[in-house]
Amino acid sequence: MSTGLRYKSKLATPEDKQDIDKQYVGFATLPNQVHRKSVKKGFDFTLMVAGESGLGKSTLVHSLFLTDLYKDRKLLSAEERISQTVEILKHTVDIEEKGVKLKLTIVDTPGFGDAVNNTECWKPITDYVDQQFEQYFRDESGLNRKNIQDNRVHCCLYFISPFGHGLRPVDVGFMKALHEKVNIVPLIAKADCLVPSEIRKLKERIREEIDKFGIHVYQFPECDSDEDEDFKQQDRELKESAPFAVIGSNTVVEAKGQRVRGRLYPWGIVEVENQAHCDFVKLRNMLIRTHMHDLKDVTCDVHYENYRAHCIQQMTSKLTQDSRMESPIPILPLPTPDAETEKLIRMKDEELRRMQEMLQRMKQQMQDQ
C-alpha cells in the first residue's frame, strides 16, 4: 500500500513533460487566438430605434449604454411634429469596457408615426435598410475587401404605445415591411403607466396579434443540450417575457438607502433595474450580454443573404435577357423530358435512395458493435 502511495505522489520528470509535449499539437489554443484578434479589432453594432415620439426611445438608449447620444437634439413643438417628415439620423459612439471596444451606431427615426396621415410612413426606413445592404454588397463584390465597413442594421427596437389595446395599424404595417430585412424586437414603452395585470394582458394581446398578422419578430435561438441550468432558465425567462415592458430613466434617486436609476412618483419609486418593476434588465442582458452576436449572425446569414440572393438573381436574369437580345442565333428553350426519360430518372432516384438506406443500416450496425 505504501509503495502505491509513493508511486502516486511521484513528481513528473522532464522526460514525462517531453512526452506530454510530443502528444500536444496546440490547436486547443485557437479560441484564445480568435479572442485576442477580435478584441484587438473591436466590435461594431448598429441598433435602430423606431416608434412614435414621446415613448422614451432616447432615454432607453441612454439607460442601456450609459452614453448620451442626443446632446445636440432639438426638441420640436407639436405643430412642427405634425408637419415633420420621417428622417434617418445616425449617432455613432466608441465605447470601451474592460479593454473591449464597441463601435455603437444608433439609427433614430424622428417623425415616424407623428403625422395625421401615416400611410407608408415606414418607406424611408425600409429604403435606408436596403441602402445599407446594397452598399455592403457593392463593397463585398469590389476588389478591396479588406476593410469593409458594416453599416447593416443588426436590430430594431420597435416601441409600442402602452395606451392602446394592442397593435395599431401603423405598428402592423411597419413590422410587416421590415420583418424580412431586420431583427425586430418589440417593446412596450413606458411600462410604469400600467399595473402588472394590465402589462400581462397587453403582452398576451400583442403576442396574439403578431401571430395573427404573420409578423416575424426576432426569435431567440434554442439552447444547446450542454448549456448549464442557469443559462437555460435565463433563456426561458427571456422567451416568456417578450415583448419586453421597459422603463428608461437618466435620473438617480434614493430607494431604501441606495442610489438607483428610476422615477420618483407621489406613490413611490419605480426602479429601472428592478425586475419586479419592468423588463429592462432582461432586455439589456439579451441585447448586450447574451444575444448581440446572434443578432449579427442572423442579419448576415439570413436577412443579408436573402437580399444578396435576390440581387444575384436579378443580375442573372438581366444578363440572360441581354444575351438573348444580342445573340444572332435564337436561344431555344430546353426540351421537356419525355415519358421514357422521366421513367429513367425515377429509377435512378429509387436506386440512390436504396443505396442511402443500405449505408445508413451499415453505419448503425457499426455503431451497435
Swiss-Prot record:
Domain Septin-type G: 41-314
GO biological process: adult behavior; cytoskeleton-dependent cytokinesis; protein localization; regulation of exocytosis; regulation of synaptic vesicle exocytosis; social behavior; synaptic vesicle targeting
Molecular-function GO terms, alphabetical: GTP binding; GTPase activity; identical protein binding; molecular adaptor activity; structural molecule activity
Disulphide linkage map: none
InterPro entries per record: G_SEPTIN_dom (IPR030379), P-loop_NTPase (IPR027417), Septin (IPR016491)
Modified sites of kind Phosphoserine: 225, 327
UniProt-annotated stretches for the region G1 motif: 51-58
Omega-N-methylarginine modification, residue list: 168
Subcellular location as annotated: Cytoplasm; Cytoplasm, Cytoskeleton
SUPFAM superfamilies hit by this protein: P-loop containing nucleoside triphosphate hydrolases (SSF52540)
Coiled-coil spans in chain: 338-369
Primary site of residence: cytoplasm
CDD domains found in the cross-reference section: CDC_Septin
Superkingdom as given in the UniProt entry: Eukaryota
Region G4 motif, annotated ranges: 189-192
Binding site for GTP: 51-58, 85, 111, 190-198, 248, 263
Region G3 motif, residue ranges: 108-111
Modified residues (Phosphothreonine): 13, 336
Tissue expression remark: Expressed at high levels in the CNS, as well as in heart and platelets (at protein level).
Modifications after synthesis and translation: Phosphorylated by DYRK1A. In platelets, phosphorylated in response to thrombin, phorbol-12-myristate-13-acetate and collagen.
Miscellaneous section: In a heterologous system, SEPTIN5 overexpression has been shown to exert dopamine-dependent neurotoxicity. As wild-type PRKN, but not familial-linked PRKN mutants, ubiquitinates mouse SEPTIN5 and promotes its degradation, it has been suggested that a deficiency in SEPTIN5 degradation may contribute to the development of early onset Parkinson disease 2 (PARK2).
Its job: Filament-forming cytoskeletal GTPase. May play a role in cytokinesis (Potential). May play a role in platelet secretion.
UniProt cross-references to PANTHER family, sorted A to Z: SEPTIN
Assembly information from the UniProt record: Septins polymerize into heterooligomeric protein complexes that form filaments, and can associate with cellular membranes, actin filaments and microtubules. GTPase activity is required for filament formation. Interacts with SEPTIN2 and SEPTIN5. In platelets, associated with a complex containing STX4. Interacts with PRKN; this interaction leads to SEPTIN5 ubiquitination and degradation. Interacts with DYRK1A. Interacts with STX1A; in the cerebellar cortex.
Entry's family note: Belongs to the TRAFAC class TrmE-Era-EngA-EngB-Septin-like GTPase superfamily. Septin GTPase family.
Name of the protein in its database record: Septin-5
This protein's encoding gene: SEPTIN5
